[in-house]
């Protein structure tokens, strides 16, 4: 077995396909990553968590890197914009959500440590970003 794995982004399952605009692709599992979790997200205009929910984690720190566009982030009680080339680290216990208000798509890479039960580590924060 080789000590590496290669996949094209288009080969990674888009979990949003047919259900929600844009893309979310959990690259981690399809490249057999052992220690690092990596997710690609494409967000068309008016998609994300604004007007509804946010989330936090029990143990996963996350780093969001903006590949394209300009995105609004709500982190605890602060709202600010990040654009292409910006990165933000968010501690596990910190509530967060991302929104795209711009006409062009926003694209993100989200990186964290790989854990056994990612769904069990995520805590939904209802009514987090109500306008």
Regions found by a protein language model. Give the residues of each.
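A short, N-terminal "cap"/entry segment at the start of jelly-roll beta-barrel domains
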Residues: 1-38, 123-131
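A generic "binding-loop/recognition-motif" signal
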Residues: 59, 78, 94-95, 104
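Glycine- and acidic-residue-biased ligand/ion/polar-headgroup-sensing regions
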Residues: 59-71
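Double-stranded beta-helix
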Residues: 99-131
């Amino acid at each position: 077995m080789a000590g590496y794995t290669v996949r094209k982004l288009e080969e990674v399952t888009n979990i949003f396909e047919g259900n929600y605009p844009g893309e979310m692709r959990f690259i981690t599992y399809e490249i057999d990553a052992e220690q690092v979790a990596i997710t690609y997200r494409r967000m068309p205009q008016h998609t994300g968590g604004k007007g509804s929910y946010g989330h936090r984690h029990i143990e996963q720190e996350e780093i969001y890197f903006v590949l394209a566009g300009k995105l609004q982030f709500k982190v605890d009680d602060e709202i600010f914009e990040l654009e292409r080339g910006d990165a933000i680290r968010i501690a596990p216990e910190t509530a967060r959500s991302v929104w795209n208000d711009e006409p062009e798509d926003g694209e993100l890479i989200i990186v964290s440590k790989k854990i056994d039960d990612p769904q069990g580590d995520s805590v939904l924060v209802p009514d987090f970003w109500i306008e």
